[in-house]
Amino acid sequence: PCTSTTNMAQSTHKRKAANGHLGITEESRMLNSILIKMVSEIDTELRTGLRFVFTIEQPKSADVTEIPALKMLTEREDVYRAEFSMCWFGVPYQKHTYIWTNIKPLADALNQRRCSKDNPCAYFNRHEQVKGNSDECTPFPPQLCALIKDHVACHVSKRRFEPYCLPCA
């Protein structure tokens, strides 16, 4: 369902302000219901589960941050949105991507990996074009997976010996 938010798919899914950025297709509705459930669970865990960490990835598009469920996440002070380019992680295409997380060092590390003239990746000025079906761009590059894994492991290991208790009401 993530493809319902990509720039290439907007002529089909039509996530526009006029429909509250919810889109018009069954795929859009499916992603919306997944996001609503996921954000509800994340919100509950962030309020009650002190040892909870998460990441949500979505392709960057003009209006993806306006999808109501993702907008709710962005408005939280303990959630950080990172914007980065997949080409920084060893793939030849420049897929601009968002990740929402509650691990600030991860968001900071990802934000440093936006491909541009001032911050070029190894493929700068010779990125491969993705036309039509974007399925080949869907898998996370191993370097990105390793970065996320390292930050999650570091974050949870620092908290391993903290006493676990719920916040006072």
Feature names for model-found ranges:
Residues P1-A169:
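Conserved active-site and SAM-binding loop architecture
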